[in-house]
């Protein structure tokens, strides 16, 4: 026995694996002796106290066969095991890896039920012949009595169905859908998908059948989409019922710091000079040509002269009322007194222009 264990270790070394150490070989010998001692006691007990016909030198398979026979199972010489009286046919014998080709009559295996959705066809051009694929137009009328069991009658009735759909004799035939089957690419739907195929709309140009949003008067539809250039839509008065639009400047700290009243000279500028200041974005002033209508689009002057710069004037220190006055932060080379700057944070009121 010692030589056999040593030979096994030597064979493992010849196979290219690591040669076990002396302590590992000793542990393997001790473990094998313990296993064989336990097996010998089991065999002795079965022979003494049980009705088991075990050979003198038997292995574990013999013990398993004996236990199966006592429990009412039958073990054939090739290892096929089954309950007594429920011998499976030859075609249903399990394969070498243990899988059964079909469930045995006495097994608890139940085949899974059929899926709730219709199987997809092999081709994306025609509906499956195994499902109900008749064409229904309008209600429950069947064109030509076409069923899904045959493909040739379905192909023959294609011109008939197209003529029915395009004919004016049937004004009420609006809905064209397929019950079951699929005419799209074969896609496996999820388990939670509905079993009914959605309808195909064919009444897009019919004036009598309109979507529900076409006839209703929704105020959010014209306001949420930009109007066309030739058609202007006034906003709904209901949208502006709770708003108060103030003509005063916004309550922004930057806006209040630009000028005490940047547009207070608007009326005087119209009468005195050709340049006026029009409110633009962020409270800035833009030079425009005089004589333009008040609500017309602002046209910028291409070549603005140098005397229009912030705080500059052609008359020296005498600033004309129509020019833009720069705020104190933009005067880089000048010193501004602290008392000339008034902070009006959080207030929408503008103070009068100091003269």
From Swiss-Prot:
Q: What GO terms describe the biological role, i.e. biological process, of this protein?
A: brassinosteroid mediated signaling pathway; DNA-templated transcription
* Chain positions covered by the region annotation Required for DNA-binding: 18-102
Q: Where is the composition biased (Gly residues)?
A: 1-16
Which is one GO molecular function term here? Answer: DNA binding
The entry's function note states: May function in brassinosteroid signaling.
PANTHER family annotated for this entry? BES1/BZR1 HOMOLOG PROTEIN 3-RELATED, BES1_BZR1 HOMOLOG PROTEIN 3
UniProt name for this protein = Protein BZR1 homolog 3
Q: What is the lineage of its organism?
A: Eukaryota, Viridiplantae, Streptophyta, Embryophyta, Tracheophyta
């Amino acid at each position: 026995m010692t030589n056999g264990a040593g030979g096994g270790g030597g064979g493992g070394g010849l196979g290219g694996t690591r040669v076990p150490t002396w302590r590992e070989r000793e542990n393997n010998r001790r473990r094998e002796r313990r296993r064989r001692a336990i097996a010998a006691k089991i065999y002795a007990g079965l022979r003494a106290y049980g009705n088991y016909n075990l050979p003198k030198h038997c292995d574990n398979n013999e013990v398993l066969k004996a236990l199966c026979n006592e429990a009412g199972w039958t073990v054939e010489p090739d290892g096929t095991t089954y309950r007594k009286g429920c011998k499976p046919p030859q075609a249903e014998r399990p394969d070498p890896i243990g899988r059964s080709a079909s469930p045995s009559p006495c097994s608890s295996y139940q085949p899974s039920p059929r899926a709730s959705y219709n199987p997809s066809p092999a081709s994306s051009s025609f509906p499956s012949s195994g499902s109900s694929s008749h064409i229904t137009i309008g209600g429950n009328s069947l064109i030509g009595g076409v069923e899904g069991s045959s493909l040739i009658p379905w192909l023959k009735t294609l011109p008939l169905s197209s003529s029915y759909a395009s004919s004016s004799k049937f004004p009420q035939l609006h809905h064209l859908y397929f019950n079951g089957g699929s005419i799209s690419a074969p896609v496996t739907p999820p388990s939670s998908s509905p079993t009914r195929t959605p309808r195909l709309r064919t009444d897009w140009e019919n004036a009598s059948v309109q979507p529900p949003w076409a006839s209703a008067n929704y105020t959010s539809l014209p306001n949420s989409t930009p109007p066309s250039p030739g058609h202007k839509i006034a906003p709904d008065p209901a949208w502006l019922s709770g708003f108060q639009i103030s003509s005063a400047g916004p309550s922004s700290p930057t806006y209040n710091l630009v000028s005490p009243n940047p547009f207070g000279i608007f009326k005087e500028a119209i009468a005195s000079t050709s340049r006026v200041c029009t409110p633009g974005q962020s409270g800035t002033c833009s030079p425009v040509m005089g004589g333009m209508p008040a609500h017309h689009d602002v046209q910028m002057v291409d070549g603005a002269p140098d005397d229009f710069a912030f705080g500059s004037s052609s008359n020296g220190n005498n600033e004309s009322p129509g020019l833009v006055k720069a705020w104190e932060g933009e005067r880089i080379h000048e010193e501004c007194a602290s008392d000339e700057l008034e902070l009006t944070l959080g207030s929408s009121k503008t103070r009068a222009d100091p003269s």
